[in-house]
């Protein structure tokens, strides 16, 4: 008997920037696309700026850029965390991060 396949891992990251200008937000989105796409095991990738028109009471407005990467397995996610491009992204971009919130969940 085979064991059931592990569920995908959803890695959602919300960045609040020190420089919250449109230029800085766009630069982070571009860096996400440059360094964080096409990693082994990625089944979905998306990044973008906060949808400013949404001001409902339930909307969290304390972030500037969102990143969502879905990995086929937890092992794929764990390899991504150690990948040179991921580490380079952090090294180049973290100086402008006021806060980073990460939400990992099963898909």
Model features per residue range: what roles?
Residues 74-95, 100:
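C-terminal structural segments of small proteins and small subunits
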Residues 1-68, 72-79, 105-107:
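Short S/T/G/P-rich N-terminal loop/turn motif that feeds into the first structured element of a domain
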């Amino acid at each position: 008997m085979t064991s059931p396949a592990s569920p995908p891992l959803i890695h959602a990251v919300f960045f609040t920037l020190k420089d919250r200008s449109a230029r800085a937000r766009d630069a982070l989105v571009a860096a996400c696309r440059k360094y964080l796409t096409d990693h082994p095991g990625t089944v979905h990738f998306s990044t973008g700026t906060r949808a400013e028109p949404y001001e409902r009471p339930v909307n969290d407005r304390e972030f500037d850029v969102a990143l969502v990467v879905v990995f086929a397995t937890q092992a794929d996610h764990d390899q991504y965390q150690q990948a040179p491009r991921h580490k380079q992204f952090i090294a180049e971009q973290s100086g402008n991060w006021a806060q980073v919130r990460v939400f990992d969940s099963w898909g």
